[in-house]
Amino acid sequence: MAFERQGKIEKKISYSLFLNGPNVHFGSILFGAVDKSKYAEELCTHPMRQAYNTLDSNSRIIITVQSVAILDGKLVW
């Protein structure tokens, strides 16, 4: 990813994913920053991989997750 290679963003904080709760069908992903208003506890990080060799309008980024669970209304990884 060009911004990471140019040193404009840090690899450690390159995205944040907000799932929006257990009973909704959408969320949001923010690249290049973390929105601290969307969480109260420690963040989890997961490796990302590109589906294609280049990132363009037809590309997508895949985040592979083995499992996600909601326990007492809280997301458990």
Curated annotation (Swiss-Prot):
- The record's disulfide annotation reads none
Alphabetized InterPro entries for the sequence: PEPTIDASE_A1 (IPR033121), Peptidase_aspartic_dom_sf (IPR021109)
Residue ranges of the Peptidase A1 domain? 1-77
Protein name, per record: Uncharacterized protein YGL258W-A
